[in-house]
Amino acid sequence: MIAEIGRGNFGRALLRLLNTHLADWETESLDKAPDSSRIPNIDILRRARVVIPAVPIASFGEVLRQIAPYLQPGTIVIDVCTIKAHTARQMHSLLPEHVELIACHPLFGPESLAAAGWQLKGLNLVIWAERIQAERYDRIREGLRDLGLNVIELSPQDHDRILARSQFLSLLIGAVLVRMDIQSTEMNTRSFDELLDVRDTTCHDYGILRDVFRFNSACDATLAELEKTLGDIGAELRKSRLPGPG
């Protein structure tokens, strides 16, 4: 059985994917971590072979603390948060050693899944064996490839370094476009339409942007470089402007 924790936008999308593409597995969705008054949730966690906490990065550690006592030996916990090094450290420090760990980042969300008709072919997914038997990890990795996913193996540290100069940058630029209230015009070029696509695909992700910056220290350098570069380009443009008449 697969136990998915979290019913936010991505949690609901993940549950739909599991029910669609892994229909032969029993799947249960938990709205929150268990407590003593929610015995069914505890029973689900004890029976689960795979547990996927699809929760915000800021609450990931607390969810791990709450589920840790109920995870059985050999249970696989798969982290699907946007940031990997921080959550990998939390899994190692908060979960018992008899639990196996996989770090995973699906590089897609509900909007892109809906646009793809909820099919996985060609979508990117980062994965890393944090603490798991090699044969079990290999079966999972190849199973994901069989679903059509483009599986990328990256350590959490490499993942976060690359993300700081890719996804973080697109989220940051999208937030700038939203704050500037950039809108479509009757004079759109193709490149401007693509810029609006960045705005539209990231306009609901400010919370993710904030968490990515908060929990990925590599983003500091990217933000500082962007600020400096914009300042340098602005200064160059103003310097190049021809003086007005007189």
Which residue stretches match the model-derived regions?
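NAD(P)+-binding Rossmann beta1-loop-alpha1 motif at the extreme N-terminus of oxidoreductases
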Residues: 1-43
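Short glycine-/small-residue-rich Rossmann-like dinucleotide-binding loops
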Residues: 55-57, 81-82, 130
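Internal alpha-helical scaffold of NAD(P)-dependent oxidoreductase catalytic cores
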Residues: 120-202
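Rossmann-like NAD(P)(H) cofactor-binding subdomain of soluble oxidoreductases
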Residues: 65-114
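Interdomain hinge/lid region at the active-site interface
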Residues: 184-246
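Active-site capping/gating segments
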Residues: 30, 102-136
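Rossmann-like NAD(P)-binding element
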Residues: 42-71, 76
